[in-house]
Amino acid sequence: MAVSLGDDDADELPSMLWGLDPVFSSYCRLYITDILLMKESRQVPGIYFYKTHPIFQVDVLGIVVYKREREDFYCYGVDDSTGVINCLCWKDEKWRDQGGSTTCGDASGFPRSFNIEDELKGLKEAERKSTVLEIGDLLRVRGTVKTSRDNREIKATSFYKVHDPAMAVQISRMLELPQLYRKCYDQPFKMPSDDLGSTEAGGSSHPQYLLSRAVLTLKEFLLEKEVTRFRPYDVEFLLHPLIQRSSAEQEADQPGTSFATQVGKLLKETLSFLQDEGQIFRKKRTQDEVYNVTEQDKDLHIAIKDVLREDTKREKYAEKGCHVLHILSSVRQRYSQNLSREVLEVALTFLESNSDIISTTEAHYIVL
């Protein structure tokens, strides 16, 4: 069956179901214009939707139309004839400190007899050149989609220059993409009915679906109202319509539990789910159940930036920056012992999207 989520959410599945879509775990070969126009998820920052498919990593092929070099990375503008997107490509550490290119042969220009050292140098030089591109070169990039300062870009996990003198690779790509769109990306996501519960007798009252809707409702409320902290009774009313709808569908089949009990149970599960995701956290474990919203907690953001600013001055962290576990330990000492790694990673992602910090590797960060 095709998933139906109502008029307001027809374009976005609950996050708990994303893993069932094979597109989610693949590098999607989309046109750049579609990557630029994809809507960001309201549930999880850094996830985007092309129609009903959740996407966070892509595979693009195009011509380099501009190039900017920094100490640790290159910024390439890649054009596939539908649009241009900025690709952030980190330099390989083994090439950073290498000066000029490696040459083989003697001073007269004639090649010498076979020499294993010269051959290895030649292979290394060829490998180095494949990671340094100029305007007009054909570049293939795989990476994650990011939004920085309201501009969409790709943070490369792998990239290389494509040697395509006969344009065979580009022609193959031009023929492949329309078929991928027609057979996969433009098709609505479908899954077996038993994954959502009964198709007609209460699919929207299925516990997993109900929890997904509650999580989405609470996330949208916290984002729209820019809530910094709250107590459970402050947001309980948001779940009333969900329970009322669910109770009406189940009324004919079974008596069910009381309304207040259902609301309390769903609220507890929703808050637990958001805590596991790192979206909310409790700064102090007290009887007064107060939750802080990670993306709105300015004090947490300041603590993270202070740790990075102070520790990256030390020689040990000057080049790569601070590792996530080091940041977590330091922030726990100065802000809250209850901080989890999931909360820290959500905060780091938020700060990076606002260009307050930058990741130098998968798990190292520096402050700008």
From Swiss-Prot:
- List the record's Gene Ontology CC terms alphabetically: chromosome, telomeric region; CST complex; nucleus
Q: Quote the gene name from the UniProt entry.
A: stn1
Q: Which family does it belong to?
A: Belongs to the CTC1 family.
Query: What is the superkingdom listed in this entry's lineage?
Result: Eukaryota
Its function, per the record, reads: Component of the CST complex proposed to act as a specialized replication factor promoting DNA replication under conditions of replication stress or natural replication barriers such as the telomere duplex. The CST complex binds single-stranded DNA with high affinity in a sequence-independent manner, while isolated subunits bind DNA with low affinity by themselves. Initially the CST complex has been proposed to protect telomeres from DNA degradation. However, the CST complex has been shown to be involved in several aspects of telomere replication.
Keywords, comma-separated and alphabetical: Chromosome, DNA-binding, Nucleus, Telomere
Presence of keyword Nucleus: yes
Ranges for the region named Interaction with CTC1 are 2-192
This protein's name: CST complex subunit STN1
Q: What happens when the gene is disrupted?
A: Morpholino knockdown in embryos results in decreased red blood cells and an arrest in T-cell progenitors, as well as increased vascularity. The vascular defects could be rescued by wild-type gene and by thalidomide treatment.
Write down the DNA-binding region ranges.
Answer: 58-162
Q: Where in the cell is it found?
A: Nucleus; Chromosome, Telomere
Assembly and interaction partners: Component of the CST complex.
* Keyword Nucleus in annotation: yes
Segments of this protein annotated with the region Winged helix-turn-helix (wHTH) 1:
201-295
Q: Which organism is it from?
A: Danio rerio
Tell me where it mainly resides: nucleus
- Annotated region (Winged helix-turn-helix (wHTH) 2) at 296-368
